[in-house]
């Protein structure tokens, strides 16, 4: 049985008592600001009962934008301001370029051989180059345009057929849409076990979030088993591995044109040609990255964008008017139609500010001792960049908690991590390599949902009754499904 974090922490304390007497935490004169901590568990008690990104942000407001967090055995630095984010992601970018080892990475990501979790070194550099030049290049992202358009149109038809006045579960529809787009991009076609594959990925993403007892007490292997996490991850990995093996074994031979290549085609071509030292497990790890990380982040962003627009009728009217005037009754949307729609892009940027997919950017690890702001940072120290706090820093953002797309009008701030008060995809060497693909998978689906339909809450609910509660997994999702009632907009060939 899988244990809760609270129960796991209690278990951890009990196990540690068997090994040594309780002692106070050691401190030095040259230590970062921190909250009071307990023996063994460190600061974990401050985070029990709250979402990790909100708990860490509350602590940062009290103890500073550069603070120490002791997570069990793991010493951690938390950066919660643009100033310190710039410092660690530029001056100390290489120093903090490693990834900490995790139980999930070991089991699910084929011994940390994917792009996201692989340690800094030659193998990671080759994967990063592969992403830049092949898998996630602008040309490759563009090559998937037709399948994005086709699947978005399928969503429109599905919603139109749902029945007048009936609520639509947009959470489920959007996740399924993005999963289908990415499976076709990854494998060249929809897969026959699509539903099972998607459910397995969902379960992995659910297990990935938060501070897990197995990762905060890495040396106490018994906790990995007692918590149930190792068994659960092993079981889910075996199912996933079997599915991917079936997909690869049924995959057709090489394409005649590189423009027709799926992501799997590219990886198999490079593996067979020995251009990269890729094993079959490496290929599967990278494919899982493309599918898993991309599905969760894009679907969450679309959901949050629609949620914020529902609560802000002024912005909803503005973005729908822009879309409908530009398209002028056109029945089928193509990506070229939305490239110049400035307010749609502002809506997405503001959504990513308030709801970054990874509010605590994927942790890094210190590769060598360094001195940061006069504080000595040992090797293996974990680094968390608190993007949630940075994106809502009132020193940089007026009315920081308010959804206001206009704030980005005539602003040089972009998503690429060059402005450190806005880091939806991180920055530096370990910045998310899939930002361009992710944006493409947000813009077109969102445009379809807003162009073809007007939306309202079911049962006459007031706008302020829309539940905006969060659920922390690999990304921060809505806690409850987004249920909305659509009314079809009349296009040139649709009178419905």
Swiss-Prot record:
The primary site where this protein sits is: endoplasmic reticulum
State the SUPFAM superfamilies in the record: Cytochrome P450
| Gene3D superfamilies linked to this entry | Cytochrome P450
Q: What class of enzyme is it?
A: oxidoreductase
Q: Which domain of life is it from?
A: Eukaryota
Q: In which pathway does it act?
A: Secondary metabolite biosynthesis; terpenoid biosynthesis
According to the record, which residues are glycosylated? 493
UniProt catalytic activity:
(+)-(R)-germacrene A + 3 reduced [NADPH--hemoprotein reductase] + 3 O2 = germacra-1(10),4,11(13)-trien-12-oate + 3 oxidized [NADPH--hemoprotein reductase] + 4 H2O + 4 H(+)
Q: Which sites bind heme?
A: 432
Q: TM spans, by residue?
A: 3-23
Q: Which UniProt keywords apply?
A: Endoplasmic reticulum, Glycoprotein, Heme, Iron, Membrane, Metal-binding, Monooxygenase, Oxidoreductase, Signal-anchor, Transmembrane, Transmembrane helix
The Gene Ontology CC terms held by the record are: endoplasmic reticulum membrane
The protein's name:
Germacrene A hydroxylase
